[in-house]
C-alpha cells in the first residue's frame, strides 16, 4: 500500500514504508518471544491515539501548572484507582514515563549520594538501572550484590541476609529483567527492615502475573514499594508506575517524580493504561494462568528438542520467561541473529556464570511467552515454536526456509485475546474521532 503524497516526497515515502513494513512484519509474520514486550488490544491502541499526546501537564491532578486539563485530570485519577484496585493499595503514582524513571525516583527518594543499595547480581537478572553502570550508579549510590544460588535459580537468602546486615544499605532491590521464580520477599523484607532499609521490588516483568493473581503481591509480603513498567506481562502502553504501602512513602516519591525526573508525563497513554487495567480486572487471571501454562509447556518442549533449559530441577519456570543456555551452539548473540532471520524474535542474555566481557555474546537466550499468549497461542503451539527453534539452532537449517513456516503458522493467530472486543465498524468510527474529532 502506498499513499499518494509519498509519490511527491521521496523522504516521506521512506519513513512511511519503514513504519508500515515494521508493523506488518512484527504483527503478522513474526513469533515474538522478547520477554519485555507485549501488544495492546485494538481498543487500547485506538484510545492511545488521542489528543492528549499534544497536551502538557505538570504537577498532580487538579493542581496543574497548565489549563485545559479537566478531562485529563479525571482520567488520571480514574487510572490510578483502577491500578490501585489491582495492586490493593491507595497509593499509586502513574507519572513515571518508564520503569527506569520509576526506579530512579525511588532511588532518589530513599538514598543519597554515597549510600549503598543491595541488589541481585546483573548476570542473575538485575535490570541495568539497578547497577553501577545504570541509574543507581548515575545517582552516586553504591551497588552491593547479594549472593545468588544457581542450583535454585534464586537469591541465596541466608547469604543475602548477611550482606544486608553487614553493609546496612538504604535500599534493598528485588526483581529484575531475568527471573523465572518469585524472589523471597518475606525473608528479605525482614532483613531490610532490621537495618532500616526500604525494600523495593521491581515487578516490571511480572506485573501482569501479579495483577492476574498467579503471583503473590509483594506489597502484601513485606515490600515497601513496587516499581514497574506497564507493557510486559501487563499488556499496556509503554510507561512506568510506582505503588507504595504507606502514604508517607507515596508523598516522598511523588515529590521526586515531578519536578526531578518528569515534567510532562505523556498524557495520551493514560486512557490506554486504564483500559488495559480494566482488561486485567476482567480477563487478567485467565491470561496470567495461560502465560504460565505456556511457559512451562514451552520449556518442556525445548528440552525435548535438545535445548539446555535452565531450571529443570525446579520445573523450569513459574513466570512468563524461559531461559536456554546455548553456549554449545555458538552463544546467545549468534543464535538470536539466526532466529531473527527465521522471524523468531528473541534476545541474547547474560547468565550467572558469564563474565563481564561476555556481554557481546553471552551464554543465554531469554524467551517470553506473554505476547504469543495474547495472540491466542496455547500449550500445543509452544511445541511447534520449540521445533522451529530446533531446526534453526541445533539442526542448522537455513533460517529463510523456516521463516516461511513461521509466516504460515502466524496466519492462525491474528486476533488479540484477553481484552475488550470491538467491531470493525466501531474501530473505524473511533479512529475518525481520534484523528479528526468527528463524532
From Swiss-Prot:
Entry-linked InterPro entries: PyrdxlP-dep_Trfase, PyrdxlP-dep_Trfase_major, PyrdxlP-dep_Trfase_small, Ser_HO-MeTrfase, Ser_HO-MeTrfase-like, Ser_HO-MeTrfase_PLP_BS, SHMT-like_dom
Molecular functions (GO terms): glycine hydroxymethyltransferase activity; pyridoxal phosphate binding
Residues bearing PTM N6-(pyridoxal phosphate)lysine: 232
Chief place where the protein resides: cytoplasm
Enzyme class of the recorded protein, top EC level: transferase
Binding site for (6S)-5,6,7,8-tetrahydrofolate: 126-128
Keyword terms: Amino-acid biosynthesis, Cytoplasm, One-carbon metabolism, Pyridoxal phosphate, Transferase
UniProt entry tagged with the keyword Ribonucleoprotein: no
Cofactor(s) this protein requires: pyridoxal 5'-phosphate
Any one GO BP annotation for this protein: glycine biosynthetic process from serine
Family to which this protein belongs: Belongs to the SHMT family.
Quaternary state and interactors: Homodimer.
HAMAP family: SHMT (MF_00051)
UniProt name for this protein: Serine hydroxymethyltransferase
Species name: Staphylothermus marinus (strain ATCC 43588 / DSM 3639 / JCM 9404 / F1)
Gene name tied to this protein: glyA
